[in-house]
């Protein structure tokens, strides 16, 4: 998996000022209908040993749902669950591992610190990169 490409995509996007478009990652102010609707990301990292990543944002009433999925072949799945599940829980990231795919989800509200969530996500996943 090419985690640095995913991290760069998210970092580049969140560092830009989108307030004129109705969404500001830095202050976490949402105009759900405008910005989140065009923030559906489906992308493929094309390399022999690369993984397929699927990530998207979906608007659900007064919050947004973030999901990212990718193949992750762990030799010690139990270590991931025991060591990292608490870290994810602290920032309300939920995960499941099924058929070689890791799925991570969270709910984003106006109070959500997106930078912190992504920092935690990437710091944990780098251990498996």
Set out the residue ranges of the language-model regions.
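Ampiphathic alpha-helical segments that act as solvent-exposed interaction surfaces
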Residues: 5-17, 74-129
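Amphipathic, interaction-prone secondary-structure segments
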Residues: 22-83
């Amino acid at each position: 998996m090419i985690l640095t490409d995913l991290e760069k995509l998210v970092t580049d996007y969140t560092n830009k000022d989108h307030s004129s478009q109705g969404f500001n990652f830095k202050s976490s102010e949402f105009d759900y209908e405008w910005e989140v609707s065009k923030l559906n990301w489906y992308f493929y990292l094309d390399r022999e040993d690369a993984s397929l990543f699927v990530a998207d944002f979906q608007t659900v009433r007064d919050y947004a749902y973030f999901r990212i999925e990718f193949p992750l072949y762990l030799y010690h799945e139990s270590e991931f669950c025991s060591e990292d599940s608490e870290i994810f829980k602290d920032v309300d990231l939920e995960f499941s591992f099924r058929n070689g795919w890791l799925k991570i989800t969270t709910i984003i509200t106006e109070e959500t610190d997106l930078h912190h969530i992504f920092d935690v996500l990437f710091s944990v996943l780098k251990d498996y990169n």
